[in-house]
Swiss-Prot record:
Gene3D superfamilies: LigB-like. It comes from Caldivirga maquilingensis (strain ATCC 700844 / DSM 13496 / JCM 10307 / IC-167). This is MEMO1 family protein Cmaq_1590. It comes from the Archaea. Belongs to the MEMO1 family. SUPFAM superfamilies: LigB-like.
Length: 282
């Protein structure tokens, strides 16, 4: 069995178990965090997918916490399908792991083999390629939040450096077909930061342009606006996949839970990265 060892523990998040738990709690209770508990509401609504940032926890942790706390208000998922960009271009253009475990300072989380293999069978672009995940942080930084808030749940990791609209549509449709009838048990996580390395006001303005298209569940419009205004979204393929998946599942609403930039947490406003947590509901 393959165990994917942590690559960014001690850099993007605390390397010790106690330190990491405290950092997750800090993210939740931070002035930019959700500050709320996850008492499951007694209604039939649930979260289909979320868009979550993936920077170091000291920068984006409070924004990321909004997404996971929101999920926990409605459901306790059994599986998280986590899709992120391949920042390093290592390995296959589209990669998945269909077996094994992922390790963090909080322990190991299992890959859901059934769901992963069914998705891979429907999307021929996806290669079984653990090498593509070895250095990549976009999936890894999501895992501790899932382990801490949803113990016992499993994951399906997917990374893309092929981020075309075509692949995103096919992947979103395939996940919908695999999950059909089980949406309340599965959440799709699109791991992405928004605009990069521009002043706080510029980043905020650019982010809001693409967020508007996301809230309209318009993947093509999102891509067009991103290109037109040079918004340097790193995980745009993951975001488009979540939009398509949610629409295929009959999403009845989308909500911007929180937006901030690294300047809001660090105080340095000259070169910032944008972060948003967004939830799609049914």
């Amino acid at each position: 069995m393959v165990t994917r060892k942590p690559a960014v523990a001690g850099m993007f998040y605390e390397a010790s178990k106690d330190g990491l738990i405290n950092q997750i709690k800090w993210s939740i209770e931070h002035e930019l965090g959700p500050k709320s508990t996850m008492n499951v509401k007694e209604n039939r609504q649930y979260v289909l997918s979320v868009i979550v940032p993936h920077a170091g926890y000291v920068y984006s942790g409070p924004v990321a916490a909004h997404a996971y706390v929101e999920v926990g208000k409605y459901i306790k998922p059994k599986v998280f399908v986590i899709i992120g960009p391949n920042h390093y271009g290592v390995g296959s253009p589209a990669a998945i792991m269909t077996s094994g475990t992922w390790e963090t300072p909080l322990g190991q989380v299992e890959i859901d083999e059934e769901v992963a293999k069914q998705i891979k069978a429907k999307v021929k672009d996806l290669a079984e390629d653990p090498i593509a995940f070895e250095r990549e942080h976009s999936i890894e930084v999501q895992v501790p939040f899932i382990q801490y808030l949803f113990p016992g749940s499993r994951i399906v990791p997917i990374v893309l450096w092929n981020q075309t609209i075509d692949l995103s549509r096919r992947l979103g449709s395939a996940i919908s077909e695999v999950i059909d009838g089980r949406a309340g048990e599965v959440v799709v996580v699109a791991s992405s930061d928004l605009n990069h390395y521009e002043p706080h006001e510029v980043t905020t303005d650019k982010d809001m342009k693409v967020i508007e298209r996301i809230l309209n569940m318009d993947e093509e419009g999102f891509y067009t606006v991103m290109d037109k205004y040079d918004v340097s979204v790193c995980g745009f393929g993951a975001i488009m996949t979540a939009i398509v998946y949610s629409r295929k599942q009959g999403s009845t609403g989308v909500k911007l839970l929180k937006h901030a930039t690294s300047g809001d947490t660090s105080g340095y406003l000259l070169e910032t990265v944008g972060y948003a947590s967004i939830a799609f509901y049914k």
